[in-house]
Amino acid sequence: MFSSNTFDINAYLLNLREDTTSIDISRKNLDCLPDLTRFTQLKKLICSHNNISYLPELPVGLLYLDCSHNNIKCITKLNESLEYLNCSFNIELSKMPLLNDKLMLLKCSDNDIGCLPPLKNIEMLCCPRNRLVSLPELPPTLTYLDCTNNGMRDFPCHRFHKGLKTVYCSFNKLTRLPEFNEELEKMICANNQLERLPILNDKLEILECENNKLICLPYFNNSLRWIDCSHNKLEKLPSFNNNLLHITCGHNKLKEIPTLPHLLDFINCESNRIEKLPALNRNLETLICSYNRLTVLPQLNNAVARLDCAHNKLMQLPVLNENMIQLNCTYNKINALPMFNDSLEIIIFSNNPIYTTLYGGNITLHHHRHSYMQNVMDMDEYDEFNTDSITSIRNLSQKVKTLNDFRFLFYSLKYKSCLRNFLWEKIRRPKIEAKYHPDNLHKLLETMSEDDDVSEMWIADN
């Protein structure tokens, strides 16, 4: 029976012409597929998101088949003409049939597959979240590979084939990677057991190798735009190229950061051992440097909008630019705050001397999560903000201005006499002593006689 409560598959198919080239019967609550062989011109069949448990014989000319999100347990044979197959999310599917020579794209993610057949002429292979411990030989036609979340320990080659451009192999047990080919543009190899990386090819643009066992990185090529090497054992980074836009290198053992490239707009170097940061480039928008050993911050450029410098040893902050939106400087030794701009939306500065100065310990913040920033500063994850515990930015700004004005007045008065004494001792006194020194008395007398002559002439004229 091929019907559901709302869809009659037989009636639907009877209304189709036999030369139909495309059929979409997805999400129809079907338990099985009817005979479709009479549609001799059928090229595309979508039967995803049903309850189908097996695939019947299909039209010989079929090129595109999407049977994902079903209950298929076995696929016995593929049409010789099939070019695209998506059989993902059939959680009991444990084996794939032999692939035909024309198949170019295979998606078989989120199944129970333990091994794959020879890949022949595959161009795109997506097989994440299976039980694969290895892959068959990778064909030279392959341009895209996603084998994320398996149990792989190695690749079946020493060097990626020339045409491969994108590789996702995170969440495996890989201890090494093949040499990168010349065309590789994107390598995502996070959450493995890698201790080193191959030399980066010239065209690589994106490298994500976080959560490994890396102790060093290869030199960065000039094309690299994005790197995430966080959660490793790195003690030093190679020099940054001028095209880098995004750097995430937190949770390592870094003591310093190389000179920042001109185009960089994001850097996260939290949870390291850094004592001093380099000068900030003019395009930087987000700086995350929490959980380090910083005692001073570099001057902020006009582009920085998000700054997290929590859990350091800072005693003061640099002047805030007009574009600052979010500031977190909690858990430092800050005893004074700079003036705020009108664009500032969120500031977190608890657990600093200045907080006690402004609020006298009467207003406290709840404990917050110690790590809340990944790719961007996400202040929404803070659960301690409420109307009883946070004063508006405007009121806080007024408090800071009043305090800063008072400090200026206090220190002006306190050091006024010191300044006067300093000027007397260093400038006026030496000049007076030199002028009236006995060695200079004859000069003084000459000056006095000239003064007398001038006085007599003035009296005579008047």
Predicted regions and their residues:
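Catalytic phosphate/metal-binding cores of nucleic-acid and nucleotide-processing enzymes, i.e., regions
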Residues: 7-9, 13-15
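Canonical leucine-rich repeat
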Residues: 33-36, 55-58, 75-78, 93-96, ...
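Leucine-rich repeat domain C-terminal region
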Residues: 311, 326-335, 341-412
